[in-house]
Regions:
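Compositionally biased, proline/threonine/alanine/serine-rich low-complexity intrinsically disordered stretches
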Residues: 1-39
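Surface-exposed, glycine-biased beta-strand/turn segments
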Residues: 29-137, 169
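Short, basic/aromatic beta-hairpin or loop at an interaction surface
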Residues: 76-83, 140-152
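A residue-level detector for short acidic-glycine micro-motifs
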Residues: 90, 112, 153-156, 174
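Short histidine-centered loop motifs in beta-beta connectors
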Residues: 96-99, 103-104, 143-170
Length: 174
């Protein structure tokens, strides 16, 4: 579940180490197949139990500009320099306090878990704590072909998986 905080809406990133496969017509003309250069990429599902554009939103996209500038998937600026994930946010604090389930975006194996950090705004955490662990309570999953996803800023005590555990798409993580 996403953290309870009285400071600000949560950013709930599912930080991908590489961009997900774009939907594009295939050689056969069929829509929604991965482009050939990303054919081995897993198909990522939404990692939150919410409805995009209704009660959750993209806060930041993956930065596709290889240099010092920024460019999201649509050549826009909804990212920041060097960002390697897709950050999702909830509608408001009451929704966050009720809890929204964070789920695996694709099948894989849990490779890292951190739980126990307090549920506070990242702006309320000491700078040293942020430097050591900017993701707060988190789960990282390894997927096929070297892809990884990270689910950060989870509610303290909510993590339901352990290192080494296999997971399936849609399985609750925290």
């Amino acid at each position: 579940q996403v953290p309870a905080t009285a400071q600000e809406p949560a950013q709930v990133p599912a930080q991908e180490r590489a961009p997900s496969a774009p939907s594009a017509p295939s050689a056969s003309g069929a829509p929604n197949e991965p482009s050939p250069e990303l054919a081995g990429a897993p198909r990522f599902a939404l990692p939150l139990d919410c409805t995009p554009g209704d009660d959750c939103f993209v806060q930041n996209h993956f930065d596709r500009d290889p240099g010092p500038g920024t460019r999201d998937y649509a050549c826009g600026a909804l990212t920041y320099d060097g960002h390697t994930g897709t950050d999702l946010r909830l509608l408001d604090l009451p929704q966050m306090e009720r809890g929204v389930e964070v789920v695996a975006a694709a099948p894989g194996r849990v490779v890292a878990v951190h739980d126990g950090d307090p549920d506070v705004s990242m702006h309320a955490r000491p700078r040293e704590a942020l430097a050591r662990n900017p993701s707060g309570n988190a789960v990282r999953i390894a997927h096929a072909d070297g892809w990884e996803t990270q689910y950060s800023h989870l509610r303290r005590g909510s993590v339901r998986v352990r290192v080494g555990q296999p997971v399936v798409t849609g399985q609750p993580l925290g």
